[in-house]
C-alpha cells in the first residue's frame, strides 16, 4: 500500500497494567505493526511519550515520516488528529520560489505562495552565483542562507493565509535544477559548469528537515531536474 512519504495514524491503545507492562514505545510500535507498518522512534517523539500517552489515556495520533528506508515516528498528539495532515510542495527556481501547502489526506492544495529567490542578491543569473561562491565557502553559506530566508518568508505567508504553522507540517518535497539543489544543500555548484560535469550529488533523497534548518518534524525530499544546470 502506497502511503506517500508521511502518514498519520490514530491508535486507541490499552493502557499498561501489571499483566501487560509493555513500554509506551512498544505499545505504539506493536499497534503500528498490526497495521503493516514497521517503524522506529525519533528522539523528539520519544520525549513526548510522557505526558501525552497518560493524559490522553493512550488514545493518540502518531505522525510518521518515511526517511528513505523506514518509517519514523516523528510526533505524538492526544486524540484523533489524523485528518490534520499537511505537507509542502516546493519549486525552487533560480528567480522565483513557489511553495504549496497540501492537505495530504486528500491531496487538496490549501494555498500557494511565491517569492523572488533571495539568491538574486548574488546575481540575477545562475552563472554569476556559481562564480561568486567558487572556493568561497562563506559566500556559499550566505547564498544558502538567502535560500532558507526565502522559504521562511513563504512559510509565514502560508501560515497567515491558512493558520497552519510550519511546525504543524510533516515534510516537504522540493524540486529544482541541479544548481539550485546544490545551493539548498550548501554544496559548491561549480562542478555543474565545468568539465567533466560530475556533480557533487544527484540522488539526494530524504534528509531530516531539522538538519537542513527547516521547522518540519519529518524529512525533506529533494528532486533534481537532471537535464538542467
Regions found by a protein language model. Give the residues of each.
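N-terminal glycine/serine-rich phosphate-binding loop of ATP-dependent small-molecule kinases
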Residues: 1-183, 190-193
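Secondary-structure junction/capping motif
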Residues: 20-23, 208, 227
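Residues forming the flavin
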Residues: 93, 218-220
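Generic signature of intrinsically disordered, low-complexity segments enriched in small/polar residues
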Residues: 125, 196, 200, 228-229
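Active-site phosphate-binding/coordination module
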Residues: 190-218
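Residue-level detector of conserved catalytic or cofactor/ligand-binding positions
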Residues: 221-229
Amino acid at each position: 500500500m502506497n502511503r506517500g512519504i508521511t502518514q498519520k495514524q490514530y491508535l486507541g491503545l490499552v493502557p499498561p497494567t501489571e499483566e501487560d507492562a509493555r513500554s509506551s514505545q512498544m505499545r505504539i510500535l506493536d499497534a503500528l505493526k498490526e497495521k503493516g507498518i514497521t517503524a522506529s522512534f525519533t528522539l523528539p517523539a520519544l520525549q513526548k511519550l510522557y505526558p501525552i500517552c497518560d493524559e490522553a489515556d493512550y488514545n493518540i495520533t502518531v505522525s510518521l515520516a518515511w526517511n528513505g528506508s523506514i518509517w519514523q515516528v516523528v510526533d505524538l498528539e492526544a486524540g484523533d488528529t489524523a485528518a490534520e495532515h499537511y505537507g509542502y510542495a516546493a519549486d525552487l527556481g533560480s528567480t522565483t520560489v513557489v511553495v504549496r501547502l497540501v492537505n495530504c489526506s486528500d491531496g487538496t492544495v490549501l494555498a500557494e505562495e511565491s517569492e523572488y529567490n533571495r539568491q538574486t542578491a548574488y546575481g540575477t543569473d545562475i552563472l554569476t552565483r556559481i562564480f561568486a561562491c567558487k572556493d568561497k565557502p562563506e559566500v556559499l553559506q550566505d547564498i544558502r542562507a538567502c535560500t532558507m530566508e526565502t522559504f521562511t518568508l513563504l512559510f509565514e505567508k502560508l501560515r497567515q493565509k491558512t493558520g497552519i504553522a510550519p511546525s504543524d507540517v510533516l515534510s516537504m518535497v522540493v524540486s529544482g535544477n541541479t544548481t539550485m539543489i546544490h545551493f539548498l544543500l550548501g554544496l559548491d555548484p561549480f562542478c555543474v559548469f565545468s568539465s567533466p560535469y560530475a556533480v557533487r550529488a544527484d540522488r539526494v533523497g530524504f534528509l531530516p528537515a531539522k538538519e537542513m534548518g527547516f521547522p518540519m518534524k519529518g524529512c525533506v525530499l529533494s528532486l533534481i531536474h537532471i537535464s538542467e544546470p
